[in-house]
């Protein structure tokens, strides 16, 4: 499927937002796991 510039831009925005959300959740999860495990300190 060939996307128009507008469509590919919109798709790219969703991909970037999804990646940001995923990274944010992963960072929070790792931080919580790190603070919840005393043997890492």
From Swiss-Prot:
Membrane topology: Single-pass type II membrane protein
Residue ranges of the TM segments: 14-36
GO cellular component: plasma membrane; plasma membrane light-harvesting complex
Statement: the UniProt record of this protein carries the keyword Cell membrane: yes
Pfam families: LHC (PF00556)
Molecular function GO labels: bacteriochlorophyll binding; electron transporter, transferring electrons within the cyclic electron transport pathway of photosynthesis activity; metal ion binding
Periplasmic side: 37-41
Entry keyword set: Antenna complex, Bacteriochlorophyll, Cell inner membrane, Cell membrane, Chlorophyll, Chromophore, Light-harvesting polypeptide, Magnesium, Membrane, Metal-binding, Transmembrane, Transmembrane helix
Localisation: Cell inner membrane
GO biological process, one term: photosynthesis, light reaction
Residues involved in a bacteriochlorophyll binding: 12, 30
Stored InterPro entries: Antenna_a/b (IPR000066), Antenna_beta_CS (IPR023623), Antenna_beta_dom_sf (IPR023624), LHB-1/5 (IPR002362), Light-harvesting_complex (IPR035889)
Main location: membrane
Topological domain spans for side Cytoplasmic: 1-13
Summary of subunit composition and partner proteins: The core complex is formed by different alpha and beta chains, binding bacteriochlorophyll molecules, and arranged most probably in tetrameric structures disposed around the reaction center. The non-pigmented gamma chains may constitute additional components.
Family statement: Belongs to the antenna complex beta subunit family.
Function: Antenna complexes are light-harvesting systems, which transfer the excitation energy to the reaction centers.
Protein name: Light-harvesting protein B-800/820 beta-2 chain
Species, as recorded: Rhodoblastus acidophilus
